[in-house]
Amino acid sequence: LVGSEMCIRDRWNKVKTTVKDWQVGDYIRQTSIVVIGVLITFVGSELVTQNSEKKDIQATMSLIRDELKSNRENYKSIVSEFREDERLSSLLVEHDLKHRTIPEDSLIQFRFLMGHIRSFYYSQNALDILKNSMLMQKISDKELLLQLTGIYEVLDGFRATMNGYYDMKDEIMVPFHLALTDEQTDQINRGGYEAWDIYLSDRSVRNFVRVARNYFTPDYVERVGKRIDEAIQALEKKYHLE
């Protein structure tokens, strides 16, 4: 009987050990699976988030590039218009405002120019999207960010300066044209010597036509265009934009 009890006790101890060992091993194994699963989920989620942020940054930079291209076209248009004012101003100043010493055909080509009032505008909606998003903090290239904010500041300065010229032109030329008689208006529209007799008899107009020739400092306009181009090229290179 004693031997039988010892045999039963030994078997029971083996069963307990086996059960105990299985429980510990199973717990560790299950815990490891859970931990690994959490890590995989976390890493996978992080990779998805990073990939999504990368795509969002690239899409936003593409919008900024397109916006700068549009601003570049507006810049080119207003510069082309201003160059005509500049040419007329240079022509008149070079002849000391003695317009009858200038070939009449040369004056006629500018016959509508004195009534042209323009303004420069630019958009920064795409830049504002970037500034107001969390993406700004995710961009590691801080020099590029400075370049982008810098070019919009350049555009704003150019806008103020260019529109300052056309505001001046508007203030002088609108009252001048409103004060003309019908006969004077007809002569102005022909653009020949008689038109410039009328224009240059007005002191404000005489002073204004001298302005465009030296309105901007040398190479300023070209530098603005170059800065825009450099910003566009930097974006295209950094983010592989087509």
Give the residues covered by each predicted segment.
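N-terminal signal-anchor/signal peptide hydrophobic helix marking the start
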Residues: D21-V35
